[in-house]
A protein has these predicted regions:
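Conserved beta-loop-beta element that borders a ligand/cofactor-binding pocket
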Residues: 160-185
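Conserved C-terminal active-site "lid" loop/helix of NAD(P)H-dependent oxidoreductases
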Residues: 219-221, 226-244, 260-261
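N-terminal Rossmann NAD(P)H-binding glycine-rich loop of SDR-like oxidoreductase domains
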Residues: 3-24
Length: 262
């Protein structure tokens, strides 16, 4: 894509994983509530490419979208225990502002950072912990209805629905990525659920690179690595986006140490 990519929430964990992985592959416009230090910027990106604003600010978002070809929308309150007033303002209202500004500016596509919390209530007492293990074939594939387990998950489900609306009503290409458990270097330690939904930094960067480059209408995909033990299907991400993950939590012990020969 020749036009700049707007990345909201650029200073957060997901944003930094993306920028460290594919920072040299695109022209960026970065937006965050806080200034970004030089070590958080990819090569070729300067302070002139950083916008210190809030996604709930309609005027700021309208200006940020000018000339943009694609948006990766990560900004919001990331806390699973976040209260309603915060997720309503930052995650729901903020996401609607992003979608509306993207449409008004003629942006082609938006990749929306949804979350595993949008479907976490599928993890019932009768299914866990078996669903986290290799001998269980239960899979969520993105066609199921949201089933959030907290208000943060409700806000992410609302964001997915907003994306559906703006695709249907305005023709905006939208992909919602239900992100798993993102960690660098190794999967979450001593956390079976986290290892089943592990997303490595390099797979995260590659997945969002494909969100920028691929053609799609409206999609919900799961953002995890190619883990042997998983309960989220990544087949749709592979088929529609061309996602080719490289990492697998099974290459590590439950304690997060590399297995022999890996």
């Amino acid at each position: 894509m020749d036009d700049p990519v707007l990345l909201t929430g650029a200073g957060g964990r997901v944003g930094q994983a993306i920028l460290h992985g594919i920072g040299e592959g695109h022209e960026w416009r970065l937006l965050d509530r806080e200034p970004l230090s030089a070590d958080r910027l990819p090569p070729g990106v300067t302070d002139d490419d950083v916008i210190v604003e809030d996604v709930t600010d309609t005027t700021a978002m309208t200006e940020a979208m000018d000339g943009v070809g694609a948006v990766i929308h990560l900004a919001g309150d990331p806390r699973p225990e976040a209260p309603w007033n915060s997720v309503l303002e930052n995650n729901i209202d903020g996401t609607q502002t992003v979608f509306e500004a993207a449409v008004d500016a003629g942006v082609e596509k938006v990749a929306f950072a949804s979350s595993n919390h949008a479907v976490s209530a599928y993890e019932t007492d009768t299914r866990t912990p078996d669903m986290y293990r290799t001998d269980d074939d239960y899979r969520l594939d993105g066609t199921e209805l949201p089933r959030p387990g907290n208000l943060y998950g409700v806000s992410k489900a609302a964001g997915e629905t907003l994306g559906r609306y703006y695709h249907d009503s305005e023709g905006l290409s939208v992909v919602c990525v239900r992100i798993g458990n993102l960690t660098a270097d190794h999967p979450p330690r001593n956390y079976e659920r986290g290892q089943a939904m592990w997303l490595s930094h390099r797979d995260c960067a590659h997945l969002f690179d494909r969100c920028i480059r691929a053609d799609y209408g409206y999609e919900i995909v799961y953002g995890i690595s190619d883990n042997e033990r998983k309960y989220y299907s990544i087949e749709r991400a592979k088929e529609v986006l061309g996602y080719e993950p490289q990492d697998d939590s099974a290459a590590y012990t439950l304690a997060g140490e590399p297995r022999d020969g890996t």
